[in-house]
């Protein structure tokens, strides 16, 4: 093989490796708190802002309410706990809710119920969420 052909082959190989490395860096993480952070909305019109400091704010339309709280993450499981609310919120929604989460793509967040007794929260959380 001539020197020119070798250089060309190495350049192509280097470019392919570089593309693979860059593509690997752009994948969406599948667990941990960073997966959840952002502002999300669902088909019910609920807006859920999840902050990196372990706090969140929810603005719901049905029932119309503002909810603030904290969350903890273990792997792909999140526990949410309301700390303050305004508007009509059922009494059984004062305890924690536990959900498994996944990121089907970069702009979608999905939850599956593990343990929760708050029906409005279950109805909202288990909807597909889209990054705002």
Where are these regions (language model features)?
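Edge beta-strand at a domain terminus
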Residues: 27-29, 110-132
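Contiguous, well-ordered beta-strand patches that form the walls/edges
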Residues: 42-43, 47, 58-117
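Bacterial N-terminal signal peptides that target proteins for export
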Residues: 3-14
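Short, linear, compositionally biased motifs with a strong N-terminal bias
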Residues: 16-19
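C-terminal motif of bacterial Sec signal peptides marking the signal peptidase cleavage site
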Residues: 21-24
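N-terminal helix-cap/turn-to-beta initiation motif at the start of protein domains
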Residues: 26-41, 48-51, 130-132
């Amino acid at each position: 093989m001539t020197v020119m052909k070798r250089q060309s082959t190495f350049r192509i190989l280097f470019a392919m490796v570089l593309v693979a490395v860059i593509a690997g860096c752009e994948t969406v993480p599948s667990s941990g708190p960073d997966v959840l952070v952002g502002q999300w909305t669902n088909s019910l019109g609920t807006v859920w802002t999840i902050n990196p400091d372990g706090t969140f704010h929810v603005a719901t339309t049905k029932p119309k309410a503002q909810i603030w709280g904290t969350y903890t993450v273990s792997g792909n499981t999140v526990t949410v706990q309301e700390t303050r609310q305004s508007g009509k919120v059922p009494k059984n929604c004062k305890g924690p809710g536990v959900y498994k989460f996944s990121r089907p793509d970069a702009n979608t967040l999905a939850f599956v119920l593990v343990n929760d007794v708050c029906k409005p929260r279950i109805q909202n959380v288990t909807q597909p969420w889209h990054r705002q």
